[in-house]
Amino acid sequence: MACGFRRSIASQLSRVLDLPPENLIKSISAVPISRKEEVADFQLSVDSLLENNNDHSRPDIQIQAMRLAEKLKCDTVVSEISTGQGTVNFKINRELLTKTVLQQVIEDGSKYGLKSELFSGLPKKRIVVEFSSPNVAKKFHVGHLRSTIIGNFIANLKEALGHQVTRINYLGDWGMQFGLLGTGFQLFGYEEKLQSSPLQHLFEVYVQVNKEAADDKNVAKSAHEFFQRLELGDMQALALWQKFRDLSIDEYMRIYQRLGVHFDEYSGESFYREKSQEVLKLLDSKGLLQKTLKGTAVVDLSGNGDPSSVCTVMRSDGTSLYATRDLAAAIDRMEKYNFDKMIYVTDKGQKKHFQQVFQILQIMGYDWAERCQHVPFGVVQGMKTRRGDVTFLEDVLNEIRLRMLQNMASIKTTKELENPEETAEQVGLAALIIQDFRGFLLSDYQFSWDRVFQSRGDTGVFLQYTHARLHSLEETFGCGYLNDFNTACLQEPQSVSILQHLLRFDEVLYRSSQDLQPRHIVSYLLTLSHLAAVAHRTLHVRNSPPEVAGARLHLFRAVRSVLANGMKLLGITPVCRM
């Protein structure tokens, strides 16, 4: 990608440096655009060439760059060669740049940037992504929103790159909280409320029974006994648990549909209640299980009895724990999917838990444990609705839709829409996702309702507005101009800046594929939208000569296509009117 320009430059460099072109491809990068000056299209970092050089004298980088530039020649692709601070810079023939980039964007469609030489030679893998994973007995809160949208982004990106992706929602549907919930429902539950609003009612019951159990030992004892009945397979207890689970999943699926998220498998800790006992037996047979004075069973991760480096895998009554069930799930998934990579997306508070799980798998002799990866994220602070603290994710989604509808109604330029509620939801979700994805995933961030709905500046609303405006341009002028175009009509600085930015899309996708951070794509799309806004103001289509109008429509169509591609990877549905 970068339309073959990178490979053409690498071929010339390989002859001078006596290195295979493949070794040079990733050292040649598209230059970020600059508002201050016109920049070259590509640059080679001389420092990157010297990284593997064993010559400790390492001559001055600038001298090396100049010597290399002198050996290179302009050709039909490269029109100018210069040097920068430790770099050799390449300017592409302007008309070739224009024609090739725009043709490539239109021809490749949703695959633009993904066919790049940066990705060539990378094997297609089987990848499992576990994300969202709410606890059935507890509130489906905003932390699960982060896991949901981050996991969805990672799965989207891996799928777009041609990998075979399995999306798993691993529900917290087992454990002591179900002892509390079963007892609590028998004491405080109402069947009508459970049927009409399962997540809300189960949460209310869970809060109430926790208070009772703290004050009344008999309630705590009943809860413990109920969970033991579950573990032993008591039919009556399991029937009540199954009802809680089924009703909750139905409501989750409705919420996921609003988010535009889907899963290939709804799994859960309950699937591994028996297999976790097999894991305990396996640990015991390998001499890894140690009993404590309290009757619990632990695995020593230090190898020398360090009490601070143990992981508890069994309660004193023989019931399993979260870690045990995660071990059983990992082993089962390897048998089922034979994955090359398994990614867990949870908050950073679970970092130690996953370190221990991966370490135990290694100790058990499973070499594939190194293929398991935890992608942690920080906490969202300050996300409250007008009624106060947020309890449920659905409250947030409803608030977003309501506020966006009010915003749209107050703006004079808002178009008449067939389904204003659906548009408001899509724009609102874009606003939420962009605010979340702008920084490092690991960072905590302060949520701001005011900032999230700004139509100007670096927001999701601005991205949606840009996409809708460009779509409107195509609708207004139709596709009659788009049969062919004159490259000489797109040589203004505004056009060239957009073309240079479009060149960089594959590098941005590559960076995000390496570190799984969506911020690279977010930053790229925001810059693209700002460039499009400037071009829209200065490069008029209306009242321009047909040849000029057609060329500009080609440019704006390419921008909209790449903008839509990037938004979809992030989990955003682009709107065509707003």
Swiss-Prot record:
Sites where the protein binds L-arginine: 133-135, 144, 322, 326, 350
Residues found modified as N6-acetyllysine: 568
Domain of life: Eukaryota
Annotated family: Belongs to the class-I aminoacyl-tRNA synthetase family.
SMART domains: DALR_1 (SM00836)
InterPro entries per record: aa-tRNA-synth_I_CS, Arg-tRNA-ligase, Arg-tRNA-synth_N_sf, ArgRS_core, DALR_anticod-bd, Rossmann-like_a/b/a_fold, tRNAsynth_Ia_anticodon-bd
Function: Catalyzes the attachment of arginine to tRNA(Arg) in a two-step reaction: arginine is first activated by ATP to form Arg-AMP and then transferred to the acceptor end of tRNA(Arg).
Cell compartments where the protein resides: Mitochondrion membrane
Reactions catalysed: tRNA(Arg) + L-arginine + ATP = L-arginyl-tRNA(Arg) + AMP + diphosphate
Pfam assignment, any one: tRNA-synt_1d
Secretion signal, residue range per the UniProt entry: none
SUPFAM superfamilies (alphabetical): Anticodon-binding domain of a subclass of class I aminoacyl-tRNA synthetases, Arginyl-tRNA synthetase (ArgRS), N-terminal 'additional' domain, Nucleotidylyl transferase
Chain's gene name: RARS2
Enzyme Commission number: 6.1.1.19
MF annotations from Gene Ontology: arginine-tRNA ligase activity; ATP binding
Alphabetical UniProt keywords: Acetylation, Aminoacyl-tRNA synthetase, ATP-binding, Ligase, Membrane, Mitochondrion, Nucleotide-binding, Protein biosynthesis, Transit peptide
Cellular component GO terms, alphabetical: mitochondrial membrane; mitochondrion
Protein name as annotated: Probable arginine--tRNA ligase, mitochondrial
UniProt motif ('HIGH' region) ranges: 133-144
Residue range covered by the transit peptide: 1-16
GO biological process: arginyl-tRNA aminoacylation; mitochondrial translation
Organism of provenance: Bos taurus
